[in-house]
Amino acid sequence: MAFTLPELPYAPNALEPFFDEATMRLHHGKHHQTYVNNLNAAIEKHNELDDLSLEELLTDLSAIPEDIRTAVRNNGGGHLNHSQFWLWLRPNTDGSENHADGEIGDAIAKEFGSFETFKTEFKAAATGRFGSGWAWLVVDEAGKLKVVSTANQDNPISEGLTPVLGLDVWEHAYYLKYHNVRPDYIEAFFNLVNWDKVNELYAKAK
């Protein structure tokens, strides 16, 4: 089964002024496409993997043939992470306040004390990730919310965690607009979070 690049659920310029069109086109059409291409190239000679979903490939990496395990981890992770990432974003053209609401809002307040405390912890995870990686809000096996970060394109499902929100902190995600000021990019991200999607994923994961 060949994996394909999903379409963006909005126009490439729809996340302006927070995420610029040039970055979105490059990030989706070039970087994400490359992960898809490399993943397909890695698994094309392993017919025993044809019926596995992306999540199944990454949930038990030890079951992946050793000769392609690293390629699946890196490129499968890159494909899954980005496929989720686009859905965690939505346009906010008027720059209105964007806070967690609904069930996830209540759960964040219960686990972290307040939305602002959660946001501070998430920003610290994203800022403190040395080099390339991701910051995540995940549900652990006990159903509790946690903030974690992973290196490179590792996805938390490989560690038994279910991501309900994630932020790409690779430089390709922000350098054209925010240059080396990662904290400004992280702050911009919170203007775009699609909390409806986060609520949907949380309801399934808890």
From Swiss-Prot:
Alphabetically, the GO molecular function entries are: metal ion binding; superoxide dismutase activity
- Any Pfam family matching the protein: Sod_Fe_N
Q: Which reaction does it catalyse?
A: 2 superoxide + 2 H(+) = H2O2 + O2
Q: Which cofactor does it need?
A: Mn(2+)
- EC annotation? 1.15.1.1
The record's annotation in InterPro entries points to: Mn/Fe_SOD, Mn/Fe_SOD_BS, Mn/Fe_SOD_C, Mn/Fe_SOD_N, Mn/Fe_SOD_N_sf, SOD_C_sf
Q: Where does Mn(2+) bind?
A: 27, 82, 168, 172
Q: Which Gene3D superfamilies did the record assign?
A: Fe,Mn superoxide dismutase (SOD) domain (1.10.287.990), Iron/manganese superoxide dismutase, C-terminal domain (3.55.40.20)
| Entry superkingdom | Bacteria
Its top-level enzyme class, in one word, is: oxidoreductase
Question: Which UniProt keywords are given for this protein, alphabetically ordered?
Answer: Manganese, Metal-binding, Oxidoreductase
Q: Name one GO cellular component term.
A: cytoplasm
Cofactor binding summary note: Binds 1 Mn(2+) ion per subunit.
Question: Does the record carry Nucleotide-binding as a key word?
Answer: no
UniProt key word Phosphoprotein: no
What is the recorded function of this protein according to its Swiss-Prot or TrEMBL entry?
Destroys superoxide anion radicals which are normally produced within the cells and which are toxic to biological systems.
* Homology family: Belongs to the iron/manganese superoxide dismutase family.
UniProt xrefs under PANTHER family: 37S RIBOSOMAL PROTEIN S26, MITOCHONDRIAL, SMALL RIBOSOMAL SUBUNIT PROTEIN MS42
Protein name (Swiss-Prot/TrEMBL): Superoxide dismutase [Mn]
Q: What is the lineage of its organism?
A: Bacteria, Bacillati, Bacillota, Bacilli, Lactobacillales
